[in-house]
Amino acid sequence: MNLISVLPQDLIAILAFHINSKAKDAMLKPESISYLKQNEPIGCRDTYTRDLLLAKGVDAYFSGCMTLTLGRKYESLEKDDKVYFVDPYFLTRWNWKSTIRAVVFLCFHFLAIARIARKYPERKSFIRKCIILTGFYREYRKFFSEKILVNATYICQQDRCYSENFSSDVALLGEAERLVRLYARARLVVTSRIHCALPCLGMRTPVIFTENADQSEASACRFGGLRELFNVLSWRNGHLEPNFVVGKVDDKNKFDFANSTQWMVLAEQLSDKCLHFVKASYE
């Protein structure tokens, strides 16, 4: 595989471009580098991709992701009281000790965890979900009240959920738009999905990004320059650690934190470049 085989050869502007560390050798062959140089400067979604291209002599810069511009169409001035947890990150390393600990914890917090388990989008038995969710509830209740966790809506954006429930690209696009409109009106979104978190920034919806602090390079390379835009809760050694000052999020009207505004410059630059490109293509 090389870029020439997957990208157009006529008038083109490359923005929000990403190369994963697993694909860098295949994507940075001499013919691909030549193609990129013909179309530079290259706007890169993350600093990892930018640095890869700069090292190859390609004029590149950090552009951010196009999803930061979704607020131009989908931002909603009307907000509801809904809180969405979209694949919030948590991980339990199961052994006999952690299993016993989970069962004991569940005995003391069964009612709250059971209410979450009944609507948590996992295809597992009810009891198994409850045991798994002890890790989630134990850590997330440090930052969110029981009322928030119990009443929140839980959404799965994993690939298998879509492949099982949507049969066409048109149906998938419709579902994506439905979710974007939900997030646009949300009081708060908590997610490990970058393409949920970035649109929330663009739509000015309060968002907290959750991550695995020990993720692989192939995963971490996607976030360079983007992670700095978020309020982050990092899962490290079985515990959540915030990178921002946060009290416990409860059912009051205001939070003790706000989204960073750094994304606004990136979104404006992306919009301007796209509009300029479209106008130039008709001249």
Language-model region placement:
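Active-site anion-handling motifs in enzyme catalytic cores
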Residues: M1-E283
